[in-house]
Amino acid sequence: MARIAGTFSGRGFNIETIAVNVTDDPKISKIILTTWGNQDTIIKIEKQLHRIVDVLQVDDLTGRESVKREMALVRVKMTEEQKPELMQIIDTHKWKVVSSGADYCIMEVTGDKEEIEIALAVLKPFGMDDFSRTGAVALAKKNNNVRG
């Protein structure tokens, strides 16, 4: 992963999000990253990644039918007076409460990038105390021989 990140930073390419997970082969990790650029930039990125010996495959999902999701854990300060309204909002948006106490609520929010941004904006007025957010994970709707 360090060589991949180094390839990006050394060439002036930007990584917007990065997520790493295991595959069915414990010797292989899948790195899903989000970047941006025009078509020439994306082609250059792909060529640079293919030069890294340990890279087995590079798939550009641009223009392909795919599912992309992010996840955020959001902690909100909560008073007894706010609780009914907050629970209604959580229920309406189908967010999941993963922990709560007398003065806080931690929820799990999943969706695309825009849905996460909306959730953070909706929760900010409640006294959003902190949040942690994953990078995007993605899968093409049709298999293109992607490992794991």
Report the location of each language-model feature:
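Long, contiguous binding/interaction regions
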Residues: 1-29, 34-148
